[in-house]
């Protein structure tokens, strides 16, 4: 958003000028923008098995550490039901997964300095070994926390606890929180077990209808919406030039829907047998995507066979 403000207004806007309509522009040409997001993962309360807790932890960590967190849709805030019986177990599983992930290079300019500053902050924990080049950090969000309104753009994950009286109350309160207190509106994820059964469908429909995000992903990382060409990809409509947030306009939308509001992606709560190939915990990912690239270059049968075998063996 800072880059956008400098292009349109010639400088970074002061907080008091955010949202104003009458600010003078140095560049009046309209253009499409996609500017990132403080991506929330909403955890809907239910009874989860130990295996499901670990699986969802791997899913969340994948959404955090893909490209080492240098990603416009990287997971940043895990929104948890306070006093939910599995809350501490899920947080512990996320922290454990962060502790065993391989060390990645913090290659982005000034990211090392940002991480070193974060390491010195109060109540922040490094989950991986202190000798690692890139620390994997976690922290509980405080009231009006800076990182509710700013992308951390690194390997740092935050937890937010929402008080609730019942499931529907949590749905409404979590939606209100991410819509109004979390910066950006590019994409949001909701992890809800048995999302389409009779009992839960009303909750799922409420999430998809009321979350003001360009992509709402049920049981998946919103980034997967980007690789589906029929889905629109961009911020939720209505962002002002002087408060651009996740941007204006959209790409993809292969069906050419006029003025799409959002794309909604549904996935199974847990896939059987093995983790998906894009999970950081899937050890075959590098080989599979390498073979997929070769196959897409020439569509040869030989490379198709190699692709299949790389996924199976």
Per-region residue spans from a language model:
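Conserved C-terminal structural/oligomerization subdomain of aldehyde/semialdehyde dehydrogenase
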Residues: 58-67, 79-81, 89-100, 135-313
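ALDH superfamily catalytic-core signature
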Residues: 2-145, 218, 298-312
């Amino acid at each position: 958003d800072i880059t956008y403000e400098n292009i349109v207004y010639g400088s970074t806007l002061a907080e008091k000028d955010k949202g104003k309509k009458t600010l003078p522009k140095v560049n009046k040409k309209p253009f499409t923008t996609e500017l990132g997001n403080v991506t929330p993962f909403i955890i809907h309360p239910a009874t989860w098995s130990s295996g499901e807790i670990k699986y969802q932890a791997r899913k969340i960590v994948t959404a955090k550490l893909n490209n080492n967190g240098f990603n416009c849709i990287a997971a940043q805030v895990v929104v948890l039901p306070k006093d939910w019986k599995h809350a501490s177990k899920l947080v512990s599983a996320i922290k454990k997964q962060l502790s065993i992930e391989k060390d990645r290079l913090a290659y982005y300019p000034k990211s090392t300095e940002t991480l070193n500053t974060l390491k010195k902050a109060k109540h922040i924990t490094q989950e991986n070994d202190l000798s690692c080049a890139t620390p994997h950090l976690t922290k509980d969000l405080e009231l009006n926390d800076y990182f509710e309104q700013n992308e951390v753009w690194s390997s740092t994950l935050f937890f937010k606890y929402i008080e609730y009286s019942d499931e529907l109350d949590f749905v409404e309160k979590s939606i209100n929180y991410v819509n109004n207190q979390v910066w950006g509106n590019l994409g949001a994820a909701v992890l809800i077990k048995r999302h389409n059964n009779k009992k839960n469908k009303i909750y799922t429909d409420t999430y998809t209808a009321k979350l003001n995000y360009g992509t709402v992903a049920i049981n998946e990382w919103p980034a997967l919406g980007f690789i589906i060409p029929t889905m629109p990809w961009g911020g939720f409509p209505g962002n002002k030039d002087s408060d651009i947030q996740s941007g204006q306009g959209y790409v993809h939308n292969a069906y050419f829907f006029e003025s799409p509001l959002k794309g909604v992606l549904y996935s199974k709560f847990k896939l059987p047998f093995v983790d998906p190939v894009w999970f950081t915990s899937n050890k075959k990912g590098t080989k599979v995507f390498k073979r997929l690239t070769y196959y897409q270059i020439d569509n040869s049968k030989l490379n198709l066979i190699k692709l299949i075998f790389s996924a199976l063996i």
